[in-house]
């Protein structure tokens, strides 16, 4: 898998996260990779979904998107679709950036102006409804979850959570939409120990009554022995 960027080509980039993501993606799925960065999840999920499925990669940063497009061209040209939008609860434009790290750029800060789209807006524009969403939005995840629950789609969701307030907002909205929310091991530890939040650990949200998928997720290293929120 040819990629640029130190650490990505080693096969050791966020191994536990991508093990869990691989469990929730199947042949024929429509995957939305929201906050695609350089495309590691895009490349992996494109291989899993095969020609029967599709991957739609959302990356608002011009610089990140240039690497993403390069990686798609090298590895899965014609099978992954790169879109220049941030997702949130409304359509419009917003400031974007606010960090020297390409992995920590977010809405509402920075010097770059980017296009923002709602999930319903993207569906109206002809993007096929997702069966799986992977989200890493640097603190805007609750806005994306709000957009999701306002829409008519109910995909399986894997979402990076950047602080406890985002966890509470996302969990409340997902419960209202009848999702079961599984915290990863690090989130469960933060909650059990009442310790300071660190990093961007994940949740997986499943439409209720999908016990088979829940069991598969619960056997991964990241979600083993956790209790639903």
Where are the regions a protein language model picked out?
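S-adenosyl-L-methionine
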Residues: 1-71, 75-79, 110, 123-126, ...
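Receiver (REC) domain switch-region micro-motif
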Residues: 31, 35, 133, 157
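Conserved residues at beta->alpha junctions
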Residues: 59, 139, 161
């Amino acid at each position: 898998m040819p990629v640029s960027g130190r650490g990505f080509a080693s096969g050791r980039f966020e191994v536990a996260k991508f093990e869990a993501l691989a469990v929730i993606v199947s042949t024929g799925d429509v995957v939305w990779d929201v906050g695609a960065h350089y495309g590691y999840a895009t490349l992996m999920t494109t291989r899993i979904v095969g020609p029967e499925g599709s991957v739609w990669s959302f990356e608002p940063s011009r610089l990140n998107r240039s690497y993403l497009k390069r990686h798609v061209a090298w590895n899965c040209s014609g099978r992954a679709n790169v879109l220049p939008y941030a997702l949130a609860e409304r359509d419009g434009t917003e400031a974007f950036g606010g960090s020297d790290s390409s992995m920590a750029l977010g809405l509402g800060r920075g010097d770059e102006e980017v296009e923002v789209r709602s999930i319903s807006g993207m569906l109206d524009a002809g993007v096929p409804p997702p069966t799986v969403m992977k989200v890493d939005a640097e603190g805007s995840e609750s806005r994306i979850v709000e957009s999701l629950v306002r829409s008519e789609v109910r995909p399986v969701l894997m979402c990076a959570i950047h602080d406890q307030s985002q966890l509470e907002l996302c969990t409340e909205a997902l419960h209202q939409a009848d999702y079961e929310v599984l915290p990863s091991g690090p989130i469960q530890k933060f909650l059990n120990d009442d310790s300071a939040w660190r990093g961007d650990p994940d949740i997986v949200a499943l439409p209720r009554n999908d016990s088979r998928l829940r069991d598969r997720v619960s056997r991964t290293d990241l979600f083993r022995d956790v209790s639903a929120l």
